[in-house]
């Protein structure tokens, strides 16, 4: 599924992959593996079914598109920057480990992550914060391990699955962008957030 607001946001993935010499096939395998990992946990977490993930996406779309303001907290955000953002009106989308800089998470809509946010991502997942979880060629094992662990939480996080291939992957979306921060902005735009 492609839901990028502009095809160029998906095309950049091919450009970056090509510049680094990374194989597209690895990203395809990762996308399918991510969907499979979520499916294997459906017994423990029914909301991780395809319908459940679609409901999570619909809920996030409604929340984000109706928010007066949405701020993306970039991966390198400091605690001071996070404090300033958390004092503003509106919702916050955190890029991966930047969620650790947020002292108060009451306005945190979701975390966009490729599973390398460490303890901060784990903590947000344990709190039941929705995760826009991304599969790519070098995080297959890390994503499977994280989903397996998260499925055991008292309140597993709602999931939206994403990938970075130019073709569709049943059960996952491609909103565009390459880094967690890029993908957070692309996700916000795809959810109908006004870029102003």
Q: What are these regions, as identified by a protein language model?
A:
Residues 74, 81-86, 103-105:
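Short, glycine/acidic-enriched capping/hinge loops at junctions between secondary-structure elements
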Residues 90-91, 97-193:
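Acidic/Gly/His-enriched mid-domain segments of enzyme catalytic cores or analogous surface patches
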Residues 72-77, 177-180, 195-196:
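Glycine-rich anion-binding loop/nest that anchors nucleotide
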Residues 70-74, 86-93:
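Extracellular/luminal Protease-associated
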Residues 1-70, 78-84:
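N-terminal donor/sugar-recognition subdomains of glycan-related enzymes
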Residues 77-78, 99:
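Short active-site-proximal "capping" loops at secondary-structure junctions
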């Amino acid at each position: 599924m492609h839901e990028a607001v502009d095809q160029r946001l998906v095309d950049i993935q091919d450009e970056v992959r090509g510049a680094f010499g990374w194989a597209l096939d690895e990203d395809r395998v990762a996308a399918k593996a991510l969907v499979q990992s979520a499916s294997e946990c459906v017994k423990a977490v029914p909301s991780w079914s395809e319908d459940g993930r679609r409901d999570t996406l619909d809920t996030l779309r409604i929340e984000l598109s109706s928010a007066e303001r949405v701020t993306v907290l970039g991966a390198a955000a400091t605690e001071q920057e996070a404090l300033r953002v958390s004092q503003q009106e509106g919702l916050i989308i955190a890029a991966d480990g930047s969620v650790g800089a947020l002292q108060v998470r009451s306005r945190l809509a979701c975390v966009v992550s490729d599973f390398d946010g460490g303890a901060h991502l784990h903590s947000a997942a344990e709190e039941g914060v929705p995760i826009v979880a991304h599969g790519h060629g070098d995080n297959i094992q890390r994503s499977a391990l994280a989903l397996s662990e998260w499925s055991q939480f008292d309140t597993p996080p709602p999931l939206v699955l994403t990938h970075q291939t130019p073709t569709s992957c049943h059960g996952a979306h491609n909103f565009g962008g390459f880094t967690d921060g890029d993908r957070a902005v692309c996700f916000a735009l795809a959810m109908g957030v006004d870029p102003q």
